Amino acid sequence: MEIGKNNMDTCNMASSDKDVKIHFKVARFIMEAGVKLGMHSVPIATACTIYHKFYKETSLENYDPHLVAMSAIYLAGKVEEQHLRTRDIINVCHRYNNPGSEPLEVDSKFWELRDNIVHCELLMLRMLNFRVSFQHPHKYLLHYLISLKNWMNRHSWERTPIATAAWALLRDSYHGDLCLRYEPQQIAVAVLYFALQCYGVEVPSNSNAETSWWQVFSEDITILTINNIISDLIHIYTMDTEIV
């Protein structure tokens, strides 16, 4: 019995790892399609969050992830008031999956796909109980960066791309489900902490201060939470090297 249990656990782990990689690739698809559609960073983040949240309620076997992704993009555009035409979403996504191809003809296949996107959008709304508006880390990170820039040595700040790195880390975090497992303030602090670490930049007087700089920004956060988020980010980048 123990051998059978171990085999089942191994199969479950392999299946889970496969699912994580699929979600990674589909999240990248959402991000790249979003950029081609001219979406801003917050609507793209909302689309990724809707996608990840939807698959917390169901499994990949039940719904086509690329259809869910297109519907998430369409819905996110409405939520964030950056409305997108289904025709544009369909054509951008079609070209993403079929590089160099011509736009789809407006025929029965096109209208069937359009109807599927709309029906999937309604399904997602029902499954998520119409809770599709989210607080993202973006506004917190912007505030923290401005505060830290005024706090730090100007030369140290200007010679290292801390802000650029922090924004890139935040964007890449949406390849996984960090947005569902941590508070937005925690993610904002963690990506900033990681960016500072990457460039070896120290926050002035932090070692002598009674309160660490990250607790000034988010008083409930701990170094353990920061390290857990960084560990998850490193796992995302490791996965990126493994996925062709």
Swiss-Prot record:
Cross-referenced SMART domains: CYCLIN (SM00385)
Signal peptide: none
Cellular component terms (Gene Ontology): nucleus
InterPro entries for the chain: Cyclin-like_dom, Cyclin-like_sf, Cyclin-Q_first_cyclin_box, Cyclin-Q_second_cyclin_box, Cyclin/Ssn8, Cyclin_N
UniProt xrefs under Gene3D superfamilies: Cyclin-like (1.10.472.10)
GO MF assignments: cyclin-dependent protein serine/threonine kinase regulator activity
Superkingdom of the organism of origin: Eukaryota
UniProt KW keywords: Cyclin
Gene Ontology annotations of biological process type: regulation of transcription by RNA polymerase II
Keyword check for Chaperone: no
Annotated family: Belongs to the cyclin family. Cyclin-like FAM58 subfamily.
Job of this protein: May be an activating cyclin for the cyclin-associated kinase CDK10.
Protein name from the UniProt record: Cyclin-Q
Natural source organism: Xenopus laevis (African clawed frog)
